[in-house]
C-alpha cells in the first residue's frame, strides 16, 4: 500500500494528497471549476499506485487510455457515451470489486461497474470520489446494461486468473479484464462478438453502423492474448 505525499497545482493553489485524502487550502481552485482538469492531474500523479478510499476499501489506478462504451442501441440516433477505464476498486476485505470509470465529459462523473449488479454512480467527479465519497456513497444501481470496450466486446471481471501464468484461458462471448496490482497487465479475451473500428476522441460509430456489423459479422473462434497498459506520460493524459 502506497502512502502518497505529493503536491498538485490547480492554477496557483496547491493541493496535498496524503493516502487518498485531497486537501485544498482554497475553494477557488481550478478543480472546482473544471473537474475534468482535476481528474487528469490526479491520474497523472497517482498512476500505478494503490490508495485507500474514504470509508474503507482500496483503489488501484492503472491510468490507461482505454475507453469503454456506455449507451443504448435500441433506437436510431441514441448517443454512445464514452468512459475512461481508471482502475479497480475493492471494498474492505475484497468482498466486492468494481471497475472504476470516468465519463469523458466536462465533469468527469465517476462510475463503478460490478459484474452481476451493473453500473453504479459513485461521485460527481474523480476528486470527490477520492476525497469524500469512496465506495460507500454508491447508489443501488444506475444501469443494468452491459458495458462494452471500444471494439464492442463485453467488459467483465476475471477473478481467478493466475498473475504469473503465460497462457490465458478462454471464456466465450465475453471480454474479461483483470487489473493486476503487481504487473500492471490486463488479461483480455476476445470472443465471437463482432469487432468495430477503434474509437477515437474525434470519431464514434453510429448506431446504424453498429447494427450492420452486428447483423453481418460471422462467428469467430475465441482468441486470447495478454496486453500491457500504456505507461503514463507527462502532460495531459486524455
UniProtKB/Swiss-Prot annotation:
Taxonomy, superkingdom: Viruses
Q: Report keywords, A-Z.
A: Host membrane, Membrane, Phosphoprotein
Q: Which GO terms describe its cellular component?
A: host cell membrane; membrane
Q: Name one Pfam family in it.
A: DUF1314
Tell where it localizes.
Host membrane
The record describes its post-translational modification as: Phosphorylated by host.
Which family is annotated?
Belongs to the varicellovirus ORF2 protein family.
The name of this protein is: Membrane protein 2
Amino acid at each position: 500500500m502506497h502512502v502518497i505525499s505529493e503536491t498538485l497545482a490547480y492554477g496557483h493553489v496547491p493541493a496535498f494528497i496524503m493516502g487518498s485524502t485531497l486537501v485544498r487550502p482554497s475553494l477557488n481552485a481550478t478543480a472546482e471549476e473544471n473537474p475534468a482538469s482535476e481528474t487528469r492531474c490526479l491520474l497523472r500523479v497517482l498512476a500505478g499506485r494503490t490508495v485507500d478510499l474514504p470509508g474503507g476499501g482500496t483503489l488501484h489506478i492503472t491510468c490507461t487510455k482505454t475507453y469503454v462504451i456506455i449507451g443504448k442501441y435500441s433506437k436510431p440516433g441514441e448517443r454512445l457515451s464514452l468512459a475512461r477505464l481508471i482502475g479497480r476498486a475493492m471494498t474492505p476485505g475484497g468482498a466486492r470489486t468494481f471497475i472504476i470509470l470516468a465519463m469523458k465529459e466536462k465533469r468527469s462523473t465517476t462510475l463503478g461497474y460490478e459484474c452481476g449488479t451493473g453500473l453504479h454512480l459513485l461521485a460527481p467527479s474523480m476528486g470527490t470520489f477520492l476525497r469524500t465519497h469512496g465506495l460507500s456513497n454508491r447508489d443501488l444501481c444506475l444501469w443494468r446494461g452491459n458495458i462494452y470496450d471500444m471494439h464492442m466486446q463485453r467488459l467483465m471481471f476475471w477473478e481467478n486468473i493466475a498473475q504469473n501464468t503465460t497462457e490465458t484461458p478462454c471464456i466465450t462471448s465475453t471480454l474479461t479484464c483483470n487489473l493486476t496490482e503487481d504487473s500492471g497487465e490486463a488479461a483480455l479475451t476476445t470472443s465471437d462478438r463482432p469487432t468495430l473500428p477503434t474509437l477515437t476522441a474525434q470519431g464514434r460509430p453510429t448506431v446504424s453502423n453498429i447494427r450492420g456489423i452486428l447483423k453481418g459479422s460471422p462467428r469467430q473462434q475465441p482468441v486470447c492474448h495478454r496486453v500491457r497498459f500504456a505507461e503514463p506520460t507527462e502532460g495531459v493524459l486524455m
